[in-house]
Amino acid sequence: MILIDTNIIMYAAGAPHPNKQPSVRLLERIASGEIEATINTETLQEILHRYRAIKRWNDGRQVYDLARQIFPVVISVTAEHLDSARKLLDAYSGLMARDALHAALLIDEKFESIYSYDRDFDKIAGVRRVQP
């Protein structure tokens, strides 16, 4: 199984950018069943938070609903994932908490890789990042 980082969804939904079309194509391949991938509950929370913070709630609602349509099964973040994230934060200075949580879930659940544009994942042992 492959984990999809929030930035893939945000680029696909966002304004023109070099990462937009590769993100759209990846999500289309996932939606068609060509690639088996999922997201976690933190990804959905990040979508809600970001669009509310930038006062674009109507867009945020649509992006959230599309994510739920593409990813009907969402992995729940547990206290154990948070415990693992805390350990990663101890081990990697400069690592952001949300990235640590995604990485911890990926490692704990033995995911194959994470699709992301965030190079911070490259520093973490046990995490394989793939850029679309």
What are these language model-derived features?
Residues 73-115:
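Active-site neighborhoods of divalent-metal-dependent phosphate/nucleic-acid chemistry enzymes
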Residues 1-39, 52-62:
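Short, well-structured N-terminal submotif of metal-dependent ribonuclease cores
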Residues 1, 103-104, 108-132:
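Acidic, PIN/NYN-like endoribonuclease modules and their adjacent C-terminal/linker elements
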